[in-house]
Amino acid sequence: YPGVTNNICAPIIAKESKFNLNEGFYLGYSPERINPGDNKHSLDKIIKVISGSNNKITKIIGKIYETIITAGVFYAKSIEVAETAKAIENAQRDINIAFVNEVSLLCQKLNISVYDVLNAAKTKWNFLPFQPGLVGGHCIGVDPYYLAHIAKKLNSSSDVILSGRRLNDSMTGIVFKKIQKQIKKRSRLLQIGVTF
């Protein structure tokens, strides 16, 4: 979460190494942004956000990444800016999926297809095309809690972030109940998993 690198990692490294930050050691932070299985957005084709504990180390980190990242490098103003950017990228995705999940539940009650609704809505140029379903990956379901943690620490609101997370957490049970209704007694079931 925002502040971990400077407020947690740096003091531990300083204590264990007996060096001072930006004298005996430096810090850099660059969030992972790849999407496993996505060949279109491979490591070299995604803009790399980088940051460092001072301008000198940030430039060094940038030069290293510029040798492998064809999409370019974005120099964040600070490590905290880069950390927060990573957390909100994932929280935003989580919230958008929660919104579409909520719309899906409403469409069920309206006896209309959520996919018909989404197909109609995506004809507008600025509509964001998210699909209802479960949230996967190791970051999407966790980063909203990191943001909520730091928000609580700083006496700031995280109501929208946590609301989306609660809805998405409940979707596993909702999907399971839906499957149970569809399965008749003594039905044969083939379970196939897809993950990354």
What do these predicted regions represent?
Residues 1-196:
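Structural/interface elements that position substrates and couple domains in central-metabolism enzymes
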